[in-house]
């Protein structure tokens, strides 16, 4: 239960949720993420570090670049479902299974 609470706490931050949305779609390096979220590189790196420690993000090296991605299908589906549920709430579209 504590691990689930920590994961959800990490997603409660708007910047981290946006990063997770991007990383759920595929691998990105820090430069691409900085451009996508419009924040300073150190801030993005700090958020990525927190997401990695929470087990939501994995990183692999490609030469000198670090490539980040959402860690596993469960995490990707969690992010997608949260964003879809929010979209339904905002648009007033009925929920579905």
Regions from the PLM with identified roles:
Residues 1-3, 72-97:
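Amphipathic alpha-helical dimerization/coiled-coil segments
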Residues 2-42, 66-74:
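N-terminal helix-turn-helix DNA-binding core of bacterial DNA-binding proteins
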Residues 27-28, 52, 83:
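Residue-level detector of secondary-structure transition/capping positions
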Residues 31-33, 50, 54:
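Short amphipathic alpha-helical "recognition" segments used for binding
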Residues 39-42, 54, 88, 97:
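Juxtamembrane/interface motifs at transmembrane-helix termini
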Residues 47:
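Residues within the DNA-recognition helix of helix-turn-helix
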Residues 52-62, 69:
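Beta-hairpin "wing" of winged helix-turn-helix
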């Amino acid at each position: 239960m504590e691990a689930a609470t920590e994961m959800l706490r990490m997603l409660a931050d708007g910047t981290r949720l946006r990063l997770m949305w991007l990383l759920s779609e595929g691998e990105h390096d820090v430069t691409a993420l900085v451009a996508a979220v419009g924040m300073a590189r150190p801030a993005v790196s700090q958020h990525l570090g927190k997401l990695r420690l929470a087990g939501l993000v994995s990183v692999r090296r490609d030469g000198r670049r670090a490539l980040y991605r959402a860690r596993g299908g469960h995490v990707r589906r969690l992010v997608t479902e949260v964003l879809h549920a929010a979209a339904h709430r905002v648009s007033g579209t009925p929920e579905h299974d």
